[in-house]
């Protein structure tokens, strides 16, 4: 772990070894702004200076890419008939004819909170995969193919941990397998990792567990334990935890 102030050259200090290593490397950032800067400016400049024919790829989550099929569906969407939405949708359609990557960050003036974005991007749930009529032109699919063939892949922390979660489920892999991963803006890793890999348990869930414990115990194992007492202990502990957490919040 290396920490240093702004402007001392942290970025170049890890990019140069990454380029010279000969290894396939993932470079992960916390923000898409730095991700774009590394791919569009810093990496090409260093690769040219060092005279290295390095294949580089930029890969973001699917919500960053235009889905051509969903854009077609959006034309028929009722909400797209609203003047403001229709105007932005027309702008997206016009841009779609010239973009190679389909990265919505290329589209100047598109607010990341725009209601059009969910209409023209896909999710894991609504993506048709290889069954999609526009699959051969799919920007997400093409971006992942380029990443698999690249020596240096620039990603973000959200995508890295999404890949870890998907791999653990045994469903698929989002990123190429590598031996070297460099995390820039690493102070945000914990928060992002918890979002994808953490589990939450509320005091309300603990109280529900106590009630379920009592019901199951009385139904299936009556007389083998003091189920009422055990359930009461769980409920009391949950209430004590809630009170302690509330007091901690007040102290902070």
What are these language model-derived features?
Residues 5-7, 18, 30-32, 61-62, ...:
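An acidic- and aromatic-residue-enriched active-site/binding cleft used to recognize and process polar
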Residues 16-22:
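Alpha-helix C-terminal capping segments
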Residues 2-5, 104-111, 221-229, 249-250:
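Short coil/turn segments at secondary-structure boundaries
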Residues 23-153, 157-158, 218:
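A substrate-engagement module of RecA-like helicase motors
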Residues 20, 36, 41-44, 124-126, ...:
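Signature of the SF2 helicase/ATPase Hel1-core->accessory helical subdomain module
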Residues 1-14:
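Walker A/P-loop
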């Amino acid at each position: 772990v290396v920490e240093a102030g702004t402007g001392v050259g942290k970025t170049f200090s890890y990019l140069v070894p990454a380029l010279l290593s000969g290894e396939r490397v993932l470079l992960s950032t916390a923000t898409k702004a730095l991700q774009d800067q590394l791919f569009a400016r810093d990496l090409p400049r260093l690769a040219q200076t060092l005279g290295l024919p390095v294949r580089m790829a930029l890969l973001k989550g699917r919500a960053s890419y235009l889905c051509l099929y969903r854009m077609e569906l959006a034309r028929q969407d009722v909400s797209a008939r609203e003047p403001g939405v229709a105007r932005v949708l027309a702008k997206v359609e016009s841009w779609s004819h010239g973009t190679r990557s389909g990265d919505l960050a290329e589209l100047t003036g598109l607010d990341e909170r725009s209601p059009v974005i969910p209409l023209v991007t896909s999710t894991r749930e609504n993506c048709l995969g290889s069954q999609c009529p526009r699959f051969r032109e799919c920007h997400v699919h093409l971006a992942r193919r380029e990443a698999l063939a690249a020596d240096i892949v620039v990603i973000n922390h959200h995508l890295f941990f999404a890949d870890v979660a998907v791999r653990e489920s045994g469903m698929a892999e989002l990123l190429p397998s590598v031996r070297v991963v460099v995390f820039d803006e690493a102070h945000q890793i914990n928060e992002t990792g918890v979002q994808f890999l953490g589990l939450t348990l509320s005091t309300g869930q603990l109280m529900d567990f106590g009630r379920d414990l009592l019901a199951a115990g009385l139904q299936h194992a009556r007389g083998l334990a003091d189920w009422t007492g055990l359930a009461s202990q769980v409920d009391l502990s949950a209430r004590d935890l809630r009170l302690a957490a509330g007091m901690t919040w007040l102290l902070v």
